[in-house]
Amino acid sequence: MSAPGPYQAAAGPSVVPTAPPTYEETVGVNSYYPTPPAPMPGPATGLITGPDGKGMNPPSYYTQPVPVPNANAIAVQTVYVQQPVSFYDRPVQMCCPSCSKMIVTQLSYNAGALTWLSCGSLCLLGCVAGCCFIPFCVDALQDVDHYCPNCKALLGTYKRL
């Protein structure tokens, strides 16, 4: 026969491989230094033998240090600063500074400078038969006061002019 090809079996006796070598045998780790003997469990080493016969360390108990009262202790006070709220002609959700509750403000419309200017302008244009009082009925021409619905405190005012 000729030389074996890539897909032909080699001629001769077949050798069954044995177990591969261990890592230490392959790399040669600790080949010059002998391994130290394992510690014997018992009272000499501080190990306690458990119910399964294996050694285990005794539990370490940690005592928490007792805090020492400091005569120079400083009391810390937290101060919350509320951002300024801009009031417009719509209800505003905010924390009431009087009752410290989260609320949505109630609105109240009052005659302001724009209402009176509108009334005066209508009088000058000739609406003297009562039509000059129409601005007092239109909320869009009046100032707006914001009140807390819980404690009824005045929280702010929106002036149109």
From Swiss-Prot:
Membrane topology label: Peripheral membrane protein
Effect of residue 23 to A: Abolishes interaction with NEDD4
Tissue: Detected in brain, heart, lung, liver, spleen and bone marrow. Detected in myelinating Schwann cells in sciatic nerve and in bone marrow-derived macrophages (at protein level). Widely expressed. Highly expressed in liver.
InterPro entries the record matches: LITAF, LITAF_fam
An example Gene Ontology biological process: response to lipopolysaccharide
Domain commentary: The PPxY motif mediates interaction with WWOX and NEDD4.
Keyword Cell membrane belongs to the record: yes
Subunit structure comment from the entry: Monomer. Interacts with NEDD4. Interacts (via PSAP motif) with TSG101, a component of the ESCRT-I complex (endosomal sorting complex required for transport I). Interacts with WWOX. Interacts with STAM, a component of the ESCRT-0 complex; the interaction is direct. Identified in a complex with STAM and HGS; within this complex, interacts directly with STAM, but not with HGS. Interacts with STAT6.
UniProt-annotated binding residues for Zn(2+): 96, 99, 148, 151
GO terms for MF: DNA-binding transcription activator activity, RNA polymerase II-specific; identical protein binding; RNA polymerase II cis-regulatory region sequence-specific DNA binding; WW domain binding; zinc ion binding
Chain positions covered by the region annotation Membrane-binding amphipathic helix: 111-134
Keywords in alphabetical order: Cell membrane, Cytoplasm, DNA-binding, Endosome, Golgi apparatus, Lysosome, Membrane, Metal-binding, Nucleus, Transcription, Transcription regulation, Zinc
Function: Plays a role in endosomal protein trafficking and in targeting proteins for lysosomal degradation. Plays a role in targeting endocytosed EGFR and ERGG3 for lysosomal degradation, and thereby helps down-regulate downstream signaling cascades. Helps recruit the ESCRT complex components TSG101, HGS and STAM to cytoplasmic membranes. Probably plays a role in regulating protein degradation via its interaction with NEDD4. May also contribute to the regulation of gene expression in the nucleus.
Localization, UniProt: Cytoplasm; Nucleus; Lysosome membrane; Early endosome membrane
Annotated motif PPxY motif, positions: 20-23
Pfam families per record: zf-LITAF-like
PROSITE patterns, alphabetized: LITAF (PS51837)
Mutant phenotype after disruption: No visible phenotype. Mice are born at the expected Mendelian rate and are fertile. Mutant mice display altered responses to nerve crush injury, with higher numbers of macrophages in injured nerves five days after nerve crush injury, but at later time points macrophage numbers in injured nerves are normal. Bone marrow-derived macrophages from mutant mice display increased migration in response to CCL3, but not in the absence of CCL3. Mutant mice show dramatically increased survival in response to a dose of lipopolysaccharide (LPS) that causes rapid death of 40% of wild-type mice.
SMART domains: LITAF
Induction description: Up-regulated in macrophages exposed to lipopolysaccharide (LPS) (at protein level). By estrogen and lipopolysaccharides (LPS).
Major subcellular site: cytoplasm
Location of the LITAF domain: 76-160
Keyword set includes Ligase: no
Domain of life: Eukaryota
Post-translational modification: Phosphorylated on tyrosine residues in response to EGF.
Protein name: Lipopolysaccharide-induced tumor necrosis factor-alpha factor homolog
